[in-house]
C-alpha cells in the first residue's frame, strides 16, 4: 500500500512540475502558418499555450523583402491572457509576409518565433 502511495505521489509531482516549467508555445496563428489569403487580413492574432505578460509581448509584420508593415493596437487581452493581437490598418499588397513575435509568459520564460503567410488575390 505504501509503495502505491509513493508511486502515485511521485507521478503527481512530475505532472505538476511539467506544467510549471513549460514555455509559452504558439498554438494558433491567424493568418495560419503558410496560408495563402485572397485578401489582406484585418489583423494578426496569436494564441499561446500559457498566459502572457502584456508589457513584454510584441508582434511585428514585414514583407518578405524585410520592409516593415505598420500595425495598430497591439495588445494582450489582459493579465494572464493567452492571445496577442494587432490590427493591420492598411491593406497589404499581394506578396509574402513574415510575422515575428516575442513574448514573456506569466511563468517568466521568454519565447519568440515567426509565422509566414501570402496575400495572393
Language-model-detected regions and their locations in the chain:
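Interdomain boundary/hinge segments at the C-termini of tandem beta-sandwich modules
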Residues: 119-121
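N-terminal signal peptide c-region/cleavage motif recognized by signal peptidases
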Residues: 15-19
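Cleavable N-terminal signal peptides
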Residues: 9-10, 20
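Short, surface-exposed alpha-helix to beta-strand junction/turn motifs within ectodomains of secreted
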Residues: 44-46, 50-72
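Short, solvent-exposed loop/linker segments at the N-terminal edge
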Residues: 35-40
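Bacterial N-terminal signal peptides that target proteins for export
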Residues: 1-9
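Cleaved targeting-peptide boundary
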Residues: 20-29
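Short, exposed beta-strand-loop hairpins at the edges of beta-sheets
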Residues: 93, 100-116
Amino acid at each position: 500500500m505504501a509503495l502505491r502511495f509513493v508511486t502515485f505521489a511521485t507521478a503527481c509531482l512530475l505532472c505538476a512540475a511539467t506544467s510549471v516549467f513549460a514555455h509559452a508555445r504558439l498554438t494558433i496563428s491567424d493568418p495560419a502558418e503558410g496560408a495563402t489569403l485572397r485578401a489582406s487580413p484585418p489583423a494578426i492574432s496569436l494564441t499561446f499555450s500559457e498566459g502572457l505578460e502584456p508589457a513584454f509581448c510584441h508582434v511585428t509584420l514585414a514583407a518578405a523583402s524585410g520592409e516593415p508593415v505598420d500595425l495598430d493596437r497591439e495588445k494582450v487581452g489582459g493579465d494572464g491572457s493567452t492571445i496577442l493581437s494587432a490590427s493591420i490598418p492598411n491593406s497589404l499588397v499581394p506578396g509574402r509576409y513574415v510575422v515575428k513575435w516575442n513574448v514573456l509568459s506569466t511563468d517568466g520564460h521568454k519565447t519568440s518565433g515567426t509565422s509566414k503567410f501570402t496575400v495572393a488575390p
